[in-house]
């Protein structure tokens, strides 16, 4: 099966697709606008694309941030085509100007967006704690989670939950955003 991905793309996404026997179809990505919607539209016409993986907010390695209008167009295009959008919003909390950018999922009215995120880029990569809102793909997500690992370590999850409940995550993010803002000025 073919999965549309940003180009350039985070190597880990490409490796993950390869490990499970999927082919990556690279779609050009602009530094300012993110994934080329025109390129994706052409790919959907020419290839049997089964899914699309995108980092809409601060993509890696480009750092592109897709506008809300383009996110709406992306979600709509993929819903019409019947192709699920796998949104990796791992960098969404690390915005450093204005308000937190909306995820593409905010524009999803059909359950076609599978929203994924983690604390691996904000708190610590070693925690290996993430989450997914699979929309209408809940049954498939449960099955894949079950087969990929039967038991997730509860101690890191409990530590992250405590950090969130006590307000530590918000305090840390304010500090991190200030550092990113200063580094980019």
What are these regions (language model features)?
Residues 33-96:
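Active-site phosphate-binding strand-loop segment of PLP-dependent enzymes
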Residues 2, 23, 50, 82-84, ...:
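Proline-centered loop/turn at the N-terminus of a beta-strand
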Residues 23-31:
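Short beta-strand->loop structural element characteristic of the AMP-binding/adenylate-forming
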Residues 1-11:
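Conserved PLP-anchoring active-site segment centered on the Schiff-base-forming lysine
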Residues 12-19:
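Hydrophobic alpha-helical segments in the ANL/AMP-binding
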Residues 109-181:
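Conserved core segment of the aminotransferase class I/II
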Residues 3, 17, 52-53, 88, ...:
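Generic structural signal for small/hydrophobic residues in well-ordered secondary structure
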């Amino acid at each position: 099966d073919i999965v549309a991905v940003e180009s350039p793309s985070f190597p880990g996404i490409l490796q993950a697709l390869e490990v499970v026997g999927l082919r990556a179809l690279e779609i050009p990505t602009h530094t300012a606008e993110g994934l080329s919607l025109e390129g994706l539209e052409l790919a959907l016409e020419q290839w049997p694309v089964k899914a699309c993986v995108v980092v809409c907010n601060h993509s890696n390695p480009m750092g592109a941030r897709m506008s809300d209008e383009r996110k709406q167009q992306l979600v709509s295009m993929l819903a019409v085509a019947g192709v699920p959008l796998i949104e990796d919003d791992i960098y969404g909390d690390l915005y450093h100007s204005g308000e937190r950018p909306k995820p593409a999922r905010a524009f999803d009215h059909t359950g076609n967006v599978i929203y994924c995120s983690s604390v691996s880029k904000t708190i610590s990569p070693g925690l290996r704690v993430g989450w997914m809102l699979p929309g209408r793909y809940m049954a498939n997500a449960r099955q894949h989670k079950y087969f990929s690992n039967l038991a997730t370590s509860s101690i890191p999850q409990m530590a992250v939950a405590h950090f969130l409940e006590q307000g530590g995550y918000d305090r840390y993010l304010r500090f991190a955003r200030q550092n990113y803002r200063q580094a980019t000025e």
